[in-house]
Design a protein with these regions (language model features):
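Secretory targeting and sorting signals
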Residues: 1-29
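Active-site acidic/histidine clusters and adjacent loop/turn architecture
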Residues: 32-87, 91
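Catalytic cores and adjacent binding grooves of peptidoglycan-active enzymes
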Residues: 104-167
């Protein structure tokens, strides 16, 4: 409920504050809602998002698993937004499991997922998102209108969700 309320009130406050003189920007509080494996699976399943792992498991501490434990709700809703907006098949191959690069906006901290590189989703990203500078490791990136980042890592898309993408 708190998460839903936050999603409704933040944009309203931002619009109202934007109309007041001297106010430039309102930032969302950094409080995040972390989801369990079961909660995330249920939300993904509801819109037809699938997931797979080379290890056939969901244990967060095993790198060959695909885990959603401690994933941010904005990441889950961002993936759902991509699915519904694009109409493409989405298969998640990487979540919050160990083995990814560290950092504030990392897989482990719930901000990132990896998805299979299907033609449909690639075409959608290339058509509707803005090409930006390559990532530090050389991979090309696109930014959505809401500011989320989609990096083409060759075999999959590495997506960083700062927000739910207009959910």
């Amino acid at each position: 409920m708190k998460s839903v309320l936050r999603r409704v009130l933040i944009p309203i406050v931002a619009v109202v504050a934007g109309l007041l003189p001297g106010v430039v920007m309102v930032e969302q509080a950094s409080a995040l809602t972390k989801l369990s494996q079961a909660q995330a699976e249920s939300l993904f399943r509801a819109v037809g998002i699938t997931w797979s792992s080379s290890g056939g498991c969901t244990n967060r501490n095993i790198s060959t698993c695909t885990s959603f434990a401690q994933i941010n709700d904005t990441t889950v809703y961002g993936a759902r937004t991509l699915k519904t907006a694009s109409g493409c098949a989405i298969n998640i191959t990487g979540g919050t499991e160990t083995g990814h690069a560290s950092g504030t906006y990392s897989h482990w901290n719930g901000y990132k997922i990896d998805i299979s590189k299907y033609t449909c989703v690639g075409n959608y990203i290339h058509t509707y998102f803005t090409r930006i500078a390559n990532r530090g490791d050389g991979y090309p990136q696109w930014r959505s209108g809401s500011g989320n980042i989609y990096a083409d890592e060759g075999s999959h898309w590495d997506i960083t969700y700062y927000n739910c993408g207009g959910c």
